[in-house]
Amino acid sequence: QALEIGSIFEMRHSVMAYERLGVGRLVYELPRESGERFLEEVFSGKEGELEEEDLGTIERFLENNLNISETARQMYIHRNTLVYRLERVQKMTGLDVRRFEDAMKLRLALMIRTDLKHRSLQGL
């Protein structure tokens, strides 16, 4: 089960201790209905309107600890382009990914979204 959770959330280890899965373990054990309800709350029903580019940008920004310059460098885009994308997400969701609490909500929502996609592919 630990390896499955690790593969869902792209943890890059061939050996995975269940105790070290952290938030991924909580998301994995979350009932589908609760996950779907959380996504609805976070994205205000506009999840389908967000482009994959926007979601990928948020993911990369979070991976880089909310560092605009480093994220822009890794994505090969101008920092103003990154700021524009983050502001576009903020307008659609009301969440400012540059604020810790909002970033936490978005990170959790993206993990839940990934888990729900995995469950759908597995027929769960």
Describe the predicted segments one by one.
Residues Q1-L124:
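Cytosolic nucleotide-utilizing catalytic cores of signal-transduction proteins
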